[in-house]
Amino acid sequence: MKVFILALLALTATTAIAQLETTCSQGFGQYQQQQQPGQRQLLEQMKPCVAFLQQQCRPLRMPFLQTQVEQLSSCQIVQHQCCQQLAQIPERIRCHAIHSVVEAIMQQQSQQQWQERQQQAQHKSMRMLLENLSLMCNIYVPVQCQQQQQMGQQQQQQQLQEQLTPCATFLQHQCSPVTVPFPQIPVDQPTSCQNVQHQCCRQLSQIPEQFRCQAIHNVAEAIRQQQPQQQWQGMYQPQQPAQHESIRMSLQALRSMCNIYIPVQCPAPTAYNIPMVATCTSGAC
C-alpha cells in the first residue's frame, strides 16, 4: 500500500513538472515572438512611413476655415503616425525596420527608375532617409544603419559577380578549344568555350530578373578592372554613343546566346567598351 501511494505521488509530481515545463516553453516562445517581430509585421508597422516618404499624402482642403491658422494636413497626420510607430520599435531592430521601408518603396517604384540610379546615389538616399527620420521624429536611429546598408549592397554585388565568373571568362575570350586526339572520326567536339558558355547561361538564368542588369554591370566592371589601366583611361564616358552601342551589343549577345530575358533598360546606368563574343561555333571562340 505504501509503495502504491509513493508511486502515485511520484507520478503526480512528474506530471506537474512536465506541465510546468510545457507552460514555460510556450510562454518563452510567445515572448520571443513578441520581442522579435518578423519582416511582415515590421512592414505593417512602418506603412505610414512608406506613405509619407513616397509623398503619397496631400494637404487637406478646409475652405470653411477663413482665419489664418495652421491647418492639419494628411501629410502631418501620416508623419505623426510614422514617428509614433518608429518610436514603438526597439532600437536594436530599427535598422531592420528602416531597411524594410526602403525595400518596400523600391519594389513599388518602376524597375527602370531604380535601375538608373548609381550605387553612390542609393547610399546618399539611404543616408538622407536616416537623417530625415531622425530629425523629423526626434528619435534615435543607430548610426551604423547606413554602414549595414552599404555592407549589404557590397556583399550582394560581390555575390552576383562571383555567380557570373563564367560569363566574364567567356566574354574575355579566355577559353580555348579542348584538344581531343581521338576518335579519328570528325565529330562535333565539345570545347571549353562551350562549357563555359553553358555555365554562364545557367548562372544567369538562376539570377532573378530584377537583378540581372546589376549582375551584368558587375561583370563589365570586373572585366574593366582586369584590363590594363592605359587601355581604359578616359573610356568611361556615358555620353559617347559608341560605348552605349558596345554595352547594347553585349546585352544582345547574352540574350541570344542564353535565350534568356534581360530587361531592355539595362544599358542606361553604365557603358563600357568591352570586347564581346556572341557565341562559340564550330569548336572555336
Swiss-Prot record:
Signal peptide bounds: 1-18
Modification after translation (UniProt): Contains disulfide bonds.
InterPro entries: Bifun_inhib/LTP/seed_sf, Bifunc_inhib/LTP/seed_store, Glia_glutenin
UniProt GO molecular function: nutrient reservoir activity
SUPFAM superfamilies membership: Bifunctional inhibitor/lipid-transfer protein/seed storage 2S albumin (SSF47699)
Function: Seed storage protein. Might be integrated via inter-chain disulfide bonds within the glutenin polymer.
Protein name: Avenin-like b1
Phylogenetic placement of the source organism: Eukaryota, Viridiplantae, Streptophyta, Embryophyta, Tracheophyta
